[in-house]
Curated annotation (Swiss-Prot):
InterPro entries: 4Fe4S_Fe-S-bd, 4Fe4S_Fe_S_CS, NADH_quinone_OxRdtase_chainI. Keywords: 4Fe-4S, Cell inner membrane, Cell membrane, Iron, Iron-sulfur, Membrane, Metal-binding, NAD, Quinone, Repeat, Translocase, Ubiquinone. [4Fe-4S] cluster 2 binds at C93, C122, C125, C128. Belongs to the complex I 23 kDa subunit family. Its EC number is 7.1.1.-. This is NADH-quinone oxidoreductase subunit I. GO terms for molecular function: 4 iron, 4 sulfur cluster binding; iron ion binding; NADH:ubiquinone reductase (non-electrogenic) activity; quinone binding. NDH-1 shuttles electrons from NADH, via FMN and iron-sulfur (Fe-S) centers, to quinones in the respiratory chain. The immediate electron acceptor for the enzyme in this species is believed to be ubiquinone. Couples the redox reaction to proton translocation (for every two electrons transferred, four hydrogen ions are translocated across the cytoplasmic membrane), and thus conserves the redox energy in a proton gradient. NDH-1 is composed of 14 different subunits. Subunits NuoA, H, J, K, L, M, N constitute the membrane sector of the complex. It is a peripheral membrane protein.
């Protein structure tokens, strides 16, 4: 028979019911509990210190790169559609929810006739916007798209920017497009430093030539 040794001989195992209740109270009710209650009551009684908003009367301002319902962009100058019908978004879609039908127009150029996205199946991963070479498809910030049916399709006319609202189209809005401060987040490469060094040398040579004159 094996010999068992108590790790903490000073700790007594409760036997009676009162000893068990007393041990449970000592372990559950401690000073940290009242500290947490004090912090909660302090934040609760503060005015204008709410961490939530009164939705739907108030809405959170989302970042431009938030991935919500898709948008198809136009060129502001010519008002033409940016989509060239390459089909990369349809091929890269991991949810298999994008369908595109293309044809050739009278000039022999590819034209997108039908474009649909199953919004109920889409997981809004953003791959379609990232792979688009023309920045034709981006993600907007319209997130209120609840529907009664699981299969909810959006079509080309639903995503494409109307011509009468083209002036309000923001170039850098939506995931897949470059941010306004994108240059600040680009990691400098050795080639960048070489170019900067060449510019410094050119400026020095220009100054020396000006002084010699």
């Amino acid at each position: 028979m094996k010999n068992y040794y108590l790790v903490d001989e000073k700790r007594k195992t409760p036997v009676s019911t009162w000893e068990k209740i007393s041990q449970a109270l000592r372990r559950s009710v401690k000073l940290e509990l009242f500290v947490g209650l004090f912090v909660m009551m302090r934040e609760l009684l503060k005015r204008n210190n709410s961490a939530t908003i009164k939705y739907p009367f108030e809405k959170v301002k989302l970042d431009n790169r938030y991935r919500a319902v898709h948008r198809l962009m136009r060129f502001i100058e010519s008002e033409n559609e940016r989509c060239i019908g390459c089909g990369l978004c349809e091929k890269i879609c991991i949810s298999n929810c994008i369908r595109m039908e293309t044809s050739l127009d009278e000039n022999g150029r590819k034209k997108v006739g039908n474009y649909s996205i199953n919004l109920g199946r889409c997981i809004y991963c953003g791959f379609c916007a990232e792979v688009c070479p023309e920045l034709a498809i981006v993600h907007g910030i319209e997130y209120e798209n609840a529907a009664e049916q699981r299969s909810y399709f959006g079509y080309k006319q639903d995503f494409l920017t109307p011509i009468d609202k083209l002036k309000n189209q923001v170039e850098f809005e939506g995931a897949g497009s470059l941010r306004k401060d994108a240059n600040l987040w680009v990691k400098k490469t050795p080639n960048y430093y070489d170019v900067m060094q060449e510019r410094v040398l050119e400026n020095q040579n220009t100054k020396e030539q000006g002084e010699n004159k």
